[in-house]
Each structure stands twice: as structure tokens, then as C-alpha cells.
């Protein structure tokens, strides 16, 4: 049988050191302490970011699906990084024009791509300060610029 953990009166230091070393195996702990959310993610740790639309693109979905998912290439204002963002709902790409200012949010699970859209980690939420959902439901109109 193994020795197990120390249980004596004077074993606190040993237990603390052991716990401190083994916490680095936890991915969430490691990411939090190393600050990777600020270093690696294009949003720099925030939930949303504004950007300028560079171009509209269609991305083919992964197998076994067959579709062209409507996306846009966006350059973020805060740091100049270029990202691809999904435009949700049927016909919403018509509301987005090049050089429009859009608000992006995360899309999918913990910074990874969602579903059958490869490499797309963000979605468009607002266009020119107006909610994309409101435009789609025809509750609001896009401001003339």
C-alpha cells in the first residue's frame, strides 16, 4: 500500500507545498495565474469588442453538414487584431456593410469554435449601434451614415 498523505501535527507545510504544486495541473487555475486571457485572446479578457468590417465571407461548414455560413472579417478597434465573426439569422448579412462598426461577442464554448463553423469564435451582436436582432425583426432601422 502507498503511504498516502502526511497526517501529523507538523505536516502543514508539506501539505501546503504539495497542494500548491499540484494546483498547476488545473487548467483554469493555470490560465488565471498566467494571465493567458489577456495575452492570447483577441478581446483581451473582455466579453465584447467593437470592430470595423473589412469584408464579407462565406465559410463552408464541416462534414457531415453542407452549407455556406455567412461571416465577416473584422478588425478590432482596441488592438487592431483581425478576427472572423459569424452573422446569425437568415438574411442578416444584408444589414452588415463593409466599413460598418460592429459589436462582437463570444460564440461557442470557452473561446473555441461552435458547431460546424471552423475557426469562428465570435458573433455579431450590433451593427452601427443597433441590435442585429432588432434589425432582423424589423423593430428598428439602421441609421444612415
Curated annotation (Swiss-Prot):
CDD domains: Ribosomal_S23 (cd03367)
Major subcellular site: cytoplasm
Keyword presence, Lipid metabolism: no
Molecular-function GO terms, alphabetical: structural constituent of ribosome
InterPro entries: NA-bd_OB-fold, Ribosomal_uS12, Ribosomal_uS12_euk/arc
Record Pfam families: Ribosom_S12_S23 (PF00164)
Alphabetically ordered keywords of this record: Cytoplasm, Ribonucleoprotein, Ribosomal protein
Protein's name according to its UniProt entry: Small ribosomal subunit protein uS12
Organism of derivation: Candida albicans (strain SC5314 / ATCC MYA-2876) (Yeast)
Gene it is expressed from: RPS23A
